[in-house]
């Protein structure tokens, strides 16, 4: 027992030393420098990412678009049929129901929470203080076999069941390369409400002077499986027709 306590004390001391040697401002600024610089990020008008998502033995084509206006969509192709998910036109949030194959509008609460993402394009950490966010180092953890700084980011509150709720996410930065390798967040709505979602990033490649992760993996902490995504191309400042975001009119 004494040995276990001694090990725990050493681990805590080491973690504290590592964290104190680097400030959260240094981590965030170094990260932004490593992926191309804050000014280049702030000049972005939009991104279009195309690739494939692995679902079991199937590879599903996927396309993700996000604009600085807040408009966004994710389009997935399943056996030749296209399904749009999390489509936001600036006012309405909607998705195609996989079972009925019909468009459905999201709840007012989900739409409000989703709309807050406009403030975070292309990166929630850009000008985070000016946005009123708070960031702090809460330790180090091992992510995919490598040490990473764990940064707690507190953003503007969201609504959960009609009540204003703290919006806290955890960002993990590789201690050597100082790039983002994982984001941890709580699922706030839907059948997985209350679960912890992990989004992992890797394979950073340059696109017109900025570096983006060409590999992502979305998973629920403690659950088997996941949804690895491999991007084949990333286009900056794409031209996208407004109709791509509009809720389909009734036939």
State each model region's role.
Residues 1-8:
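Bacterial N-terminal signal peptides that target proteins for export
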Residues 14-18:
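N-terminal signal peptide c-region/cleavage motif recognized by signal peptidases
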Residues 21-29, 33, 40, 92-163, ...:
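Flexible, processing/modification-adjacent segments and terminal tails
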Residues 22-101, 134-137:
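N-terminal mature ectodomain segment of secretory-pathway/periplasmic proteins
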Residues 62-66, 85-89, 104-111, 199-200, ...:
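Short amphipathic beta-strand/extended segments with alternating polar/hydrophobic composition
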Residues 79, 147-246:
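Gly/Pro-enriched, hydrophobic low-complexity segments
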Residues 88, 95, 140, 172-173, ...:
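Hydrophobic beta-strand positions
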